[in-house]
A protein has these predicted regions:
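Short, Lys/Arg-enriched, disordered terminal segments
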Residues: 1-2, 96
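Generic, ordered loop/turn and secondary-structure boundary motif
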Residues: 17, 25-28, 71, 110-111, ...
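Conserved beta-loop-beta/alpha segment of the NTase-like Rossmann-fold superfamily
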Residues: 75, 81-140
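Residue-level signal for pocket-adjacent positions within structured domains
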Residues: 11, 19-22, 47, 72, ...
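Short N-terminal micro-motifs specific to bacterial/archaeal maturation
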Residues: 15, 23-24, 48-51, 74-81, ...
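N-terminal glycine-rich phosphate-binding loop and ensuing alpha1 helix
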Residues: 2-57
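Conserved N-terminal catalytic core of the sugar/cofactor nucleotidyltransferase
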Residues: 34-97
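Short amphipathic alpha-helical segments
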Residues: 18-21, 61-64, 113-115
């Protein structure tokens, strides 16, 4: 069973009012997107397609994929006007694959357990989503 992960990193992060897109901001010495890519790179996923903004394709190829030796990244493609278009472009870049996982590259805290459990669930149910419980720690 071949599984491909599509990592979306084409967002502008306009609500952050920053000149740097949030997936490329530094967190602990690395760009935010590094953490998601590293986790998927070390997972049972067979291939990764990185979808990024038009002006970031070459940057991602050289300063992310090559620099950090992400060997499972088989393609870096241009995103679209919105998330839907970016997902579509990622799907178009998929070669033969049985399952596709879609992850937001600006979310660095995906875990191996989430990925492995998702792959197992896909084998049984053909579709799934990952959610985390919200914990409210303050009193109103």
């Amino acid at each position: 069973m071949k599984t491909t992960a599509i990592i979306l990193a084409a967002g502008k992060g306009s609500r952050m009012h920053s000149k740097i897109e949030k997936q490329f901001m530094e967190l602990g010495g690395y760009p935010v997107i590094y953490y998601a890519l590293k986790t998927f790179e070390e997972s049972p996923v067979d291939a990764i397609i990185l979808v990024t903004g038009k002006n970031s394709v070459e940057y991602c190829r050289h300063e992310i994929v090559e620099k950090y030796h992400f060997t499972k990244v088989v393609s870096v493609v241009e995103g679209g006007e919105n998330r839907y278009d970016s997902v579509y472009n990622g799907l178009r870049a998929c070669s033969e694959t049985d399952y596709v996982m879609i992850h937001d590259g600006a979310r660095p805290f995906v875990t191996q357990d989430m990925i492995v459990r998702s792959i197992r669930t896909l084998a049984e149910y053909k579709a799934c989503t990952v959610g985390m419980p919200v914990r409210i720690r303050s009193r109103l």
